From Swiss-Prot:
GO terms for cellular component: glutamyl-tRNA(Gln) amidotransferase complex. GO terms for biological process: translation. This is Glutamyl-tRNA(Gln) amidotransferase subunit A. Its EC number is 6.3.5.7. Heterotrimer of A, B and C subunits. Keywords: ATP-binding, Ligase, Nucleotide-binding, Protein biosynthesis. It catalyses: L-glutamyl-tRNA(Gln) + L-glutamine + ATP + H2O = L-glutaminyl-tRNA(Gln) + L-glutamate + ADP + phosphate + H(+). The active site is at K78 (charge relay system), S158 (charge relay system), S182 (acyl-ester intermediate). It comes from Zymomonas mobilis subsp. mobilis (strain ATCC 31821 / ZM4 / CP4). The gene is gatA. GO terms for molecular function: ATP binding; glutaminyl-tRNA synthase (glutamine-hydrolyzing) activity.
Amino acid sequence: MTRLTDLGVTDLRDGIAKGDFSAKEVAESFLTATNEAEKLNAFITLTPDHALKQAEKADKDRASGQLKPLSGVPLGIKDLFCTNGYRTTAASKIIDNFVPPYESTITEKLFSAGAGMVGKLNLDQFAMGSSNETSAFGNVISPWRQKGDDTALTPGGSSGGSAAAVAAKLVPAATGTDTGGSIRQPASFTGITGLKPTYGRCSRYGVIAFASSLDQAGPMAHSVKDCAALLEVMAGFDPKDSTSVDVMVPNWEKLLSSDIRGKKIGIPKEYRVDGMAPEIESLWQRGIDMMKDAGAEIIDVSLPHTQHALAAYYIIAPAEASSNLARYDGVRYGERKTPEGGNLADMYAATRAAGFGDEVKRRIMIGTYVLSAGFYDAYYIKAQKIRALIARDFEAAFDKCDILLTPATPTAAFALGQKQEDPIAMYLNDVFTVPASLAGLPAMTVPVGLNEQGLPLGLQLIGKPLDEQSVLNAGLALEERAGFTSQPKKWW
C-alpha cells in the first residue's frame, strides 16, 4: 500500500475529496515523518497545532461538501513568510523571537484554501546564500548522499529547508522564495521541481525582504502538476504590494499539457560556461533530445549580456539588501545589545554586529559601498544598465522562440563546507539562474537524471513574462520523458 507521505499535493487533495483517507491521517503521517527527521535540520519551528487544526477543518468541510482547493494538504512554509501568531526568524538571531501580528498574503491564500502548516523551514539567513550554511540555526543537510560516501551535502539555498523537506517527504510541498535562484538551485540539487513565477505574479507582502526588485515567491513540489496547483492559489493581485501585477490568474493545472509540438525551444550559446561539469553538458544535450522527441523545434539563440549577469546581480541585490536591512536596529523587536554606558548609536552598532551573520554583513557592506557617493555611478548605475540590456537580450531571443532550455546549476550538490570560505565560488552557483531573475521572467527546474555519484541533476526552462503556462507545459513534457523517480535512501 502507498504510504501517505509518498503522495504529492494533487494526489492528497483528490484522495481526501474521494474519502480514501482523512485529512487528519495525512497530517499525522507527515508530522511523524518530520519528528523522525531532526538530523536534516530542515525546520526552525514546528507547528503541529496548525496542521492538525486545518486537517480537522478539512474533514468537516468534506462531510458538508464544502472542500477548498487545498483542503487537508499539509505544507512547509519557508521561515521568510510572516505567519500571524507563529515565530518568524528569517534564520537570523536579530529577529530570533519575532512573532508577527499579521499574515503574509501568500500564507493567507494557502491557509484560506485549506492548507495546513507543518512548520517553518530553515533557510540561509535573510535568504542570502546558496548552500543553507548561513542560517543562525545551523545548516540544513540534504537527504541525498553520494554513492558509497557519507559526506553531508548541501541541499542548496536559500530555500534549502524547503528543498530538503520535500525531497525527504517530510511535506508534500513547500513555499520558497527566489531572488537569484533560491527556488531553482535547491530544487535541482535535491531532485524536486521548483517554479519561480514572473516578478509581480505572487505578492511580496509579509515576505521578509532581501532585494525588493528581485524577490519572488513560488512553489517547490514533487511534480510540475503540483507546482501548477499551488501556484494557482499563491498567485494573484494584491493592493498591499506595490509591485503586484494586476492580471487574471489562469487555471494552470487544468490547462496543463505536455503537447509541445511545433513549439520553438531556444538554446542560449552563452550558457556554455567555463567550469561547467561535463555531466551538466551531457544532461543538457539529453534535455534537448527530449524536447525534439516531444515534437519541439530547437533553435540556437544568443544572450550576449548574460556573461555580466552575475556581476550585476551581486551589485544590485546587496545594494537593495543594505537598504532593506537598515530597519533591524534593536529598537522595537528582535535582538538588542546595549553596551554599558553606550548611547543610541552604540546600541545600533552592537545589536547589528551581534545579530547579523557574516554573509549578511558582507552583503550589507558591499551594498553600502556601491551606493556611496563616490561609487554609485561606477557600480550601481552601471549594473542597472546591464540589467536593462539583459532584459532586452531575452526579448530578442523570445522573438525567435517560445521557451529557453538551460542547465539549472553548473554542478551537482557539493559537500557542506566545501565552498564556505570562498564567496566567489559560492556565488558562481547562481550563474544559470540569475539572468532570468534580473529580467523578472518565469523559470522552473525539473529533475532529469542522476550523475555517476547518484546525485540528482535538473534542467531549467525560462519563459516569456506572465507565460507560466508554456513553462509548465514544457516542464511536463520534460518530466514525462525524463521519468525521474529516484529517491534519496533514508539515512536520517
